Amino acid sequence: GYFEGFAQNPYELTILHPEQLWGATALTDLDASKNKDVFVINRYASLVEHPIMYAQPDYTTFTVQGMEILIAVYSPNRKVTAASITPEMKQMMTAQKNFLGDFNATKKYAVLLYLSDNTKPDAEGFGALEHPTSTTVVMPEMLPIDELKEQLKDVVSHEFFHIVTPLTIHAKEIANFDYNNPKMSQHLWMYEGVTEYFANLFQINQGLITEAE
């Protein structure tokens, strides 16, 4: 939360963590030490839109048309690695950038994948949530790798397109969100419907799937 009247103030977030853990995020760490991270954010709304996943380092990076992409994975039993899903993610996100053309809402984008261990008490709410510079995804670790890759292609492509709407094109209720007295937008049909339409259209347009599929 935030103190009343301070929502528009800059924030400095300091996180102390074990050396073996690394924070995957689209934010820039201003501290070079191995057990301390420092992030500076311009206002509270930006702070809550930048998730950070701490785990043993397992990530890849690549660049698509000037945008740095980070793929970070937490797999408790190490059944899946970032390297094992990166080729499909790179192909899909390259196709999306080709489809979007010059639209470039961020210079860095992070995909944070948390795989849940179904044999232990762990995350059960599977799905994904978009942010202006990242997507967080929670899926079961037990999924066969090919099925996981296929689901990730659909899920991440949908969430990535949210950088267009509602993260760039949106109503004033979204732009100036009141956390204490939220007013829901009437444009969910556009935010989700248009996004899902283009998440499928670009795959056809870029030859990733056929129109029949």
Named regions from a protein language model:
Residues Y44, A95, E159, V194-L201:
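Alpha-helical scaffold segments in carbohydrate-active enzymes
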Residues G1-T106, E124-G127:
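Non-catalytic architectural context of zinc metalloproteases
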Residues G1-E4, T28, P166, D178-N180, ...:
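Generic, ordered loop/turn and secondary-structure boundary motif
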Residues I169-D178, P182-E213:
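Acidic/His/Gly-enriched intrinsically disordered linker/tail segments
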Residues T61-H187:
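Juxtacatalytic substrate-recognition/specificity segment
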Residues A24-A26, A128, S157, G193, ...:
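Small-side-chain structural scaffolding
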Residues N9, I85, M92, V156, ...:
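Alpha-helical structural motif
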